[in-house]
Regions:
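Short, flexible helix-loop junctions that flank or precede catalytic/ligand sites
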Residues: 1-373
Length: 373
């Protein structure tokens, strides 16, 4: 199969990644599942032709020397792709990631309405958290797109790699890719404030220094958006604090209580027909009560507060799962499998409401505690 046809098929099927490896058919990832494109496995010769055929002379020389090469290609009438070429078992291969030009809309992704409000926030730190492949980049792109269309200013995005290409609309959008436009996140962030930003997006917080920059940007009156690998809001706060030595924890809790705007946690769950996935969103908003708990380091109390604060735009994963199950968007089994507390979610479903269910559950727990005493 011709390489260009593989790229076109990937776009037509809505694939996110294309895998080219000797010994298996060319495969693409669609809705989180890797599916073969053809029945025939690629030979080492075919794989080499695909890999080297996508490179220019400079890239081939780099690949021959280091056995690694990252670059971008454009296919006319098809799209742009980020390529990561490599060797495995002495044979070459590559993975291509489709670079999105069409920026998703918040409403199209069925994200909570509070996300629009957060996108227009003047200052503060907003963390998007979740495992790899849970749609954090897509939701962030929608959020930046909303800001870009509805305000004026300068958005600086530092990513590794760039997954969505934003056009200049209401805002000037500066997108810098680590390894191509800048040496590292730290080097780029060091110079960011000199570039007069209004919004700063940090593709991923991996180090203490990057986390320090995130808080600093919020402190200096900027809106900082960043992603972090964590399963939920509580775990995100625990991960942030673990970047720092114990003697700094009290100061970090104070800094977060003052500068954190929100934590948005995300999962993706298959739809019942298996043809798509639904985003499940947990939202922690830094209200005065939340700020007080964070300042004290009492993260374990946040979940209960979130469950009772729907009017502030907050919701827990279990409440979001209940809503998706109630509207028929996910199955009962998948809802329970992804719940923070399967027992709490079962009770919500049995009672037939998320908010009232949470209050009744809290009351039930209080009664049980009294009986235990």
């Amino acid at each position: 199969m011709e390489f260009e046809k593989l790229l076109r098929l990937m776009v037509e099927k809505g694939g996110s990644d294309l895998f080219i490896t000797a010994g298996v058919p060319p495969s693409m990832k669609v809705n989180g599942k890797v599916l073969p494109v053809t029945k025939n496995a690629l030979t080492p010769e075919q794989t080499r032709e695909f890999v080297y055929g996508s490179m220019n002379d400079k890239q081939r020389a780099e690949f021959d020397e280091s056995h690694e090469c990252n670059f971008a290609i454009s296919a006319r009438g098809i799209g742009r792709f980020r390529v990561s070429a490599f060797f495995q078992r002495n044979l070459c291969g590559m993975v291509l990631r489709r670079i999105e030009v069409k920026i998703p809309q918040i409403d199209d992704l069925a994200l909570p309405g509070v996300i629009k409000d957060l996108a227009m926030t003047k200052r503060g730190l907003i963390m998007f958290v979740g495992a790899t492949g849970t749609g954090k980049s897509t939701s962030l792109a929608a959020m930046l797109g909303h800001r870009n269309r509805n305000s004026r200013g300068h958005i600086i995005s530092i990513e590794d790699p760039i997954e969505f290409v934003h056009q200049h609309q209401g805002c000037i959008v500066t997108q810098r890719e680590v390894g191509i436009d800048t040496e590292s996140f730290e080097v780029a962030l060091k110079n960011t404030l000199r570039q007069a930003p209004d919004v700063i997006l940090i593709g991923e917080v991996r180090t203490r220094q990057t986390m320090e920059y995130s808080v600093q940007f919020a402190e200096t009156g900027h809106l900082c958006l960043a992603t972090l690998h964590a399963n939920n809001a509580n775990q995100a706060l625990d991960r942030i604090i673990q970047f720092f030595p114990p003697e700094q924890h009290n100061q970090i809790w104070m800094d977060l209580s003052l500068n954190l705007k929100a934590i948005v946690a995300q999962q993706l769950i298959p739809t019942p027909d298996g043809k798509g996935r639904k985003a499940v969103i947990e939202v922690l908003i830094n209200t005065p009560l939340v700020s007080d708990l964070i300042r004290k380091g009492e993260v374990h109390r946040l979940k209960e507060l979130m469950a009772k604060s729907n009017e502030s735009g907050m919701q827990t994963f279990d409440q979001a799962l209940y809503q998706l199950y109630a509207e028929g968007s996910i199955t009962y089994e998948d809802a329970l499998a992804h719940a923070d507390s399967a027992n709490d979610l079962r009770l919500m479903i049995k009672l037939g409401t998320d908010a009232q269910g949470a209050d009744k559950l809290s009351s039930s727990v209080d009664k049980l505690t009294i009986q235990d005493d």
